[in-house]
């Protein structure tokens, strides 16, 4: 990478790690290693990111479920898909991945992908080669005869929260925490306004002592819980918070305005 310094404007990696790899913290270590090879002053992003489950025995249940959903599927052969994008847990896994990228020193992440209808395997254009990766399928009824595919999937709600309240130009704050598989936290500041996000992918509630650089001012708290919708409430205003993060949930505290 050093030989390309001054030629490359930004470094870009496409990554599809496994679930265990991300939730255990191992993928963050890989990101830190990649970032260390980027010349000082240059930036690196995950220009394409999602999850794939084959190859890791710890992810075998997810891989087997992927295969089961592909078999006899009415409008895709399942080639280059993630058939689990419909599921609630994926709505936690994707912001978890984004927050690991932040904490790993990366400057951005782009989720693959917005809409199933955007892309077919090999660019064939054939419905049976559809890549199911999106937040919805805008052509669900029109092309595939299934209007339910046009419904917004749970991970849209959490991903949009991360995009809105960790916007471009934010400064990522260093987060120091005890290692806990299935839990991550990230914080950022832009224009003097702070955001903090917590994700708990575990099946048990976690109690967290949150020590912020300063007290939050006029902050809002967003919570994402089952069955898969976001609720909004007034956030606590002090800088040292004792919080309970429910099982399988996301909590986001922000001073940024909801534009």
Region roles according to the model:
Residues 178-215, 224, 248, 259:
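Carbohydrate-binding surface patches
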Residues 1-25, 107:
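Aromatic- and acid-rich polysaccharide-binding/catalytic face
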Residues 235-259:
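C-terminal beta-strand-rich structural cap/linker in extracellular carbohydrate-active enzymes
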Residues 1-3, 25-33, 95-96, 180-183:
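Alpha-helical scaffolding within the catalytic cores
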Residues 15-20, 49-54, 114-118, 202-203:
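Solvent-exposed loop/turn segments at secondary-structure junctions
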Residues 51-160, 164, 170-183:
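Aromatic/acidic polysaccharide-binding cleft in carbohydrate-active enzymes
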Residues 222-238:
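Solvent-exposed beta-strand/loop surfaces of large extracellular or lumenal domains
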Residues 9-12, 43-48, 108-112, 195-198:
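Structural recognition of the beta-strand scaffold that forms the well-ordered cores
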């Amino acid at each position: 990478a050093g030989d390309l310094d001054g030629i490359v404007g930004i470094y870009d990696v496409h990554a599809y790690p496994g679930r265990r790899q991300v939730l255990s913290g191992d993928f963050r270590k890989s990101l830190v290693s990649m970032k260390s090879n980027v010349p000082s002053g240059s930036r690196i992003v995950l220009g394409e990111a999602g999850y794939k489950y084959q190859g890791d025995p710890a992810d075998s249940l997810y891989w087997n479920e992927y295969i089961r959903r592909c078999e006899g599927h009415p409008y895709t052969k399942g080639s280059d898909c993630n058939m689990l994008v419909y599921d609630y847990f994926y709505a936690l896994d994707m912001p978890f991945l984004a927050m690991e990228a932040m904490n790993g020193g990366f400057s951005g992440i782009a989720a693959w992908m917005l809409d199933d209808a955007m892309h077919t395997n090999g660019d064939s254009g054939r419905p049976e080669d559809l890549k199911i990766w999106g937040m919805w399928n805008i052509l669900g009824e029109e092309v595939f005869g299934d209007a339910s595919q046009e419904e917004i999937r749970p991970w849209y709600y959490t991903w949009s929260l991360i995009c809105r309240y960790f916007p471009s130009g934010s400064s990522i704050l260093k987060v120091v925490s005890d290692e806990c598989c299935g839990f991550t936290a990230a914080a950022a500041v832009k224009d003097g306004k702070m955001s903090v996000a917590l994700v708990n992918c575990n099946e048990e509630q976690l109690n967290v002592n949150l020590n912020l650089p300063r007290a939050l001012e006029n902050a809002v708290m967003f919570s994402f819980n089952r069955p898969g919708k976001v609720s909004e409430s007034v956030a606590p205003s002090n800088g040292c918070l004792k919080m309970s993060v429910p099982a399988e949930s996301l909590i986001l505290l922000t001073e940024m305005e909801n534009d």
